């Protein structure tokens, strides 16, 4: 059994990001992978003339579900029960874990096989199973790499995106033999050989396991059908070979009808992997005679989702279909990777989803996440369900600041108080601008930049130059020249820098 590593105790984003930025190999791995995926996405999206209409349709379908979630959940429970499945309701991670562990124990198993699932990562199911003496074997290739390497996932879609091929080879050679079939000592780092080694290692686990655990990409309300979208075939093995199947699914994963599902099956593969369609789409509806699991359990997970639903601004995050398109275009994620976010949900979507599921104002790590963004809006431009991530980030920043009001003011609150005082009167602002212009003369160097400032401003100049303030502020120039109409030098002198344009 491999001990599962968790994000518990991770430092705030700025601290973790600084460490990640110093790792040039990590940055290279992330950059190469994200650029490849986003280039493929752009190509296949351009093939659809109605892609924007599909995005709007998907957003509308999700909003319809969220506005009537109680009704749809009742429909789901009825459909699943009629199909022979057992439905369980879990308010939080602890309750969901207890349900899964009890089912596994009732079948007297000491291991389960798993399909890649963000929901089970969110609730740290592997940790709960291990505590009960039950090994949880990840069967997704990237998840297997993370598990064997005693590592943490760093991407929603490609958890081992921070690893290159040579690193994967070393992990396989070192770790596979400890928990199952060993890798060939002559294993190379060619993708086909690495995949073959993983296939041989996992095959015996598939054939041996009596219980499988999965998540679901979608849950069709009208029939109670669960849908798993994947690329490797491991999901199909987990959903057909074991005798018992336990599916943990977030309550927001519902789509009303099969017609609605069609919209998402066009959007998800294009946004996630840059493919026109995904290689494997597995659907199952309860228990069927003969083939497949003869006992199906579905755990409907809340774990903070109803709290998010109550937030008029933040509830749009529940539209998320876990495609990871936002991560592949995010300049912050590209430079820091996923571990710096301290959550199974990294990147732009993680920066809003994690604080809303956990709650703000509870710990420094969670409170730092909404600030892990440049607010450039690239995430919103590619989101297949039109989540306005920048808007939600600003909304959450406001909540974080409000949660820390009172008591001894921190650096941010002190800075904002000072800014409020300065901007509260035109004379105070003019005096500050004049002082800034004089400081530019003292601190600036040739070329109009400042290379060194005292703390805490040194945090900027330690990494990059700061443009020197102009000798004459724009407000003074505007007043002196009547908006530029009375400035005979305006064609030659820049009002922003006070320097000759030539």
Regions found by a protein language model. Name each.
Residues 75, 79, 83, 99-103, ...:
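Generic, well-ordered alpha-helical scaffold segments in large soluble proteins
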Residues 291-317, 332-451:
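Ferredoxin-type iron-sulfur electron-transfer modules in oxidoreductases and energy-metabolism complexes
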Residues 6-37, 415-502:
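Intrinsic disorder at enzyme termini
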Residues 256-258, 272-277, 328, 335, ...:
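Acidic/polar loop patches that form or flank catalytic/metal-binding clefts of enzymes
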Residues 150-153, 177-188, 360-366, 404-408, ...:
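Intrinsically disordered, low-complexity coil segments
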Residues 1-313:
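The feature marks the mature, well-folded catalytic cores of soluble enzymes
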Residues 70, 90, 94, 196, ...:
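Conserved structured core elements
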């Amino acid at each position: 059994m491999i001990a599962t590593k968790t994000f518990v105790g991770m430092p705030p984003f700025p601290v973790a990001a600084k460490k990640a930025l110093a790792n040039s190999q990590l940055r290279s791995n992330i950059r190469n992978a994200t650029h490849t995926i986003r280039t493929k996405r752009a190509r296949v999206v351009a093939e659809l003339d109605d892609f924007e209409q599909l995005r709007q349709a998907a957003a509308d379908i999700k909003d319809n579900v969220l506005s009537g979630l109680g009704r749809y959940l009742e429909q789901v429970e009825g459909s699943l029960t009629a199909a022979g499945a057992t439905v369980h309701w879990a308010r939080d991670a602890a309750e969901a874990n207890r349900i899964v562990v009890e089912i596994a124990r009732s079948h007297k198993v000491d291991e389960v096989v798993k399909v890649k699932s963000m929901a089970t990562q969110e609730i740290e199911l592997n940790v709960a199973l291990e505590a009960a003496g039950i090994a949880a074997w990840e069967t997704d290739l990237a998840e297997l790499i993370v598990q064997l390497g005693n590592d943490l996932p760093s991407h929603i879609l490609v958890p081992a995106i921070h690893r290159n091929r040579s690193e994967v080879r070393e992990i396989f050679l070192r770790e596979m033999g400890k928990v199952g079939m060993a890798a060939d000592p002559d294993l190379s780092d060619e993708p086909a050989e690495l995949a073959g080694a993983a296939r041989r290692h996992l095959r015996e686990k598939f054939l041996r396991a009596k219980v499988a655990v999965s998540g679901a990409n979608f849950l069709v309300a009208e029939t109670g059908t669960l849908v798993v979208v994947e690329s490797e075939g491991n999901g199909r093995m987990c959903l057909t070979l074991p005798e018992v199947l336990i599916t943990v699914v977030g309550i927001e994963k519902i789509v009303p009808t099969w017609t609605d599902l069609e919209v998402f099956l066009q959007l998800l593969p294009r946004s996630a992997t840059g493919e026109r369609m995904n290689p494997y789409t597995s659907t199952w509806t309860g228990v069927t005679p003969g083939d497949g699991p003869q006992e199906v359990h579905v755990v409907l997970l809340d774990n903070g989702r109803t709290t998010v639903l109550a937030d008029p601004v933040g509830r749009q995050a529940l539209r998320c279909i876990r495609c990871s398109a936002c991560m592949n275009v995010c300049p912050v994620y590209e430079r820091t990777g996923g571990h710096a976010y301290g959550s199974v949900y990294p990147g732009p979507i993680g920066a809003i989803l994690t604080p809303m599921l956990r709650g703000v104002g509870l710990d420094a790590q969670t409170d730092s996440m909404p600030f892990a963004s440049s607010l450039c809006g690239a995430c919103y431009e590619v989101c297949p369900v039109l989540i306005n991530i920048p808007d939600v980030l600003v909304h959450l920043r406001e909540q974080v600041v409000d949660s820390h009001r009172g008591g001894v003011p921190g650096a941010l609150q002190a800075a904002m108080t000072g800014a409020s005082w300065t901007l509260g009167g035109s004379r105070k602002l003019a005096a500050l601008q004049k002082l800034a212009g004089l400081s530019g003369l003292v601190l600036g160097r040739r070329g109009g930049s400042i290379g060194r400032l005292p703390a805490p401003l040194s945090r900027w100049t330690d990494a990059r130059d700061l443009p020197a303030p102009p000798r004459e502020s724009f407000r003074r120039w505007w007043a002196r020249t009547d908006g530029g109409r009375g400035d005979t030098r305006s064609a030659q002198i820049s009002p922003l820098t006070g320097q000759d344009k030539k």
